[in-house]
């Protein structure tokens, strides 16, 4: 194979049989169970990278179980993980802290293209009589269980769609061949072409179990704030580099107590 042929075909590995195809990545009948809970603000500060900012007065985590039965190039799979509400340069969004799923294609593609923090796990999302149930197993151990009353009340579709349209942020890290970081970037991406099919709220509960390699319980559940069940079709948009950690220092806005020192 000639060098020019390698360059033309270079998209993903292995070169002759990539783990995932080029996009667009369209998802049909995507289903979410999102349980928002209050946690320890010090724990959040320890895991959210600057220049993203937290609201210390409202330290929240969104625990998500997502069923994806029909996705272009990725197939049929389920995902589970934690998203932390943040702001970046005055715009609110979500920081993807950890994700576990059961499909090689989106694990490889998610990490390589966007920088999703994906690891192999065994999540499920299903309806059992009157209850929506999400679980996450890592190996033989259960590390997360979420439950919600099935379609108790309709949610405000305008608010739900606006939340889905907010930017999301990822910390993309790709090492060099010597182990040093070759790419270390804050990546922003959005969900696009959203067709919201329904959204509901109801009572919910969430249990997280400590695990050395699936440390979702490191952000402990102090109080359940809300729960949301969503069905939608959407496209996963490609990302843009919002901040390059190898090229520029983080620019943190001055706090009120600091402004007086520079005026």
Curated annotation (Swiss-Prot):
Belongs to the ADC family. It holds the Pfam family ADC. GO terms for molecular function: acetoacetate decarboxylase activity. It comes from the Bacteria. Its EC number is 4.1.1.4. NCBIfam families: PRK02265.1 (NF002614). The active site is at residue 118. HAMAP family: ADC (MF_00597). It comes from Bradyrhizobium diazoefficiens (strain JCM 10833 / BCRC 13528 / IAM 13628 / NBRC 14792 / USDA 110). InterPro entries: Acetoacetate_decarboxylase, Acetoacetate_decarboxylase_bac, ADC_dom_sf. Catalyzes the conversion of acetoacetate to acetone and carbon dioxide. The keyword Signal does not apply. Keywords: Decarboxylase, Lyase, Schiff base. The lineage of its organism: Bacteria, Pseudomonadati, Pseudomonadota, Alphaproteobacteria, Hyphomicrobiales. It catalyses: acetoacetate + H(+) = acetone + CO2. This is Acetoacetate decarboxylase 2.
